Amino acid sequence: MSEQFLYFLQQMFNGVTLGSTYALIAIGYTMVYGIIGMINFAHGEVYMIGSYVSFMIIAALMMLGIDTGWLLVAAGFIGAIIIASAYGWSIERVGYRPVRSSKRLIALISAIGMSIFLQNFVSLTEGSRDVALPSLFNGQWIVGHSDNFSATITTMQLVIWVVTFIAMLALTLFIRYSRMGRACRACAEDLKMASLLGINTDRVIALTFVIGAAMAAVAGVLLGQFYGVINPYIGFMAGMKAFTAAVLGGIGSIPGAMIGGLILGIAEALSSAYLSTEYKDVVSFALLILVLLVMPTGILGRPEVEKV
């Protein structure tokens, strides 16, 4: 295989890895918007909290002498999901439920306030400096090689792909076949009608925040291990990129969030490789603008009809 093709293949691997985590975070944005028509701008901070919780659990277990990689990561996942889900429920209960019937600008201000509070809370309690995470998966496989370049897949990339696939599959099955999943779909179609039919809409809305937070926590654990460093400010840009992925795929559409995340991740990887890392954010947001010019509702979004 030619060196140019191997280099392109390597960037595709990197893009799918990054896009998978964007898709996980984007799920939270798209589910909340799909039901209550609001954007949870504190969602990125939940991702950040998930990465910190997993770090603390892994560090504590390693101090106790446990050094099995999969066991440490599994414990990190469980702890991060539980704590992040509690934060997701709290954000809905404190930041959204009291202002749900108010103007959207008020809810937006409330969400931004929650984001700033969580960011500064972690900064004050854990410090504002970068924290290095222990590397638990160091293996890699050579997919193809030439004289000067080899395309590889790392163990951590495989873990990210497998965990993302399992999480997406579990969410799809839950939404499609479970009783609460059907309630979520009913609320997404018509919240008022769902309430009239006896569905506890408050519980469903809280559940969407919890599910979104759990997905963000999974992404936090994965990206923390992939990059090896975290800080209290990683949630802002990750949240913005995931929001971009959700809008790109069609805000309110779960498959759209998955597709948007993958497209965005691949676009970032290719732009970093063939242009410069300085342009990756420019390319990401320019791609969003171009897609919305052609498809204003995103790739899989549906146009909304508002009654006046």
Labelled PLM ranges:
Residues L18, F149-I230, I254-I259:
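Helix-loop-helix "hairpin" substructures at the membrane interface of multi-pass membrane proteins
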Residues E3-T21, S128, I153, F174-R179, ...:
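Inter-helical junctions in multi-pass inner-membrane proteins, predominant
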Residues I35-M38, A42-S90, S150:
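Membrane-embedded helix boundary and interhelical linker motif in transport proteins
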Residues L64-M114, F121, I259-L264, E268, ...:
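Alpha-helical transmembrane segments within multi-pass membrane transporters and channels
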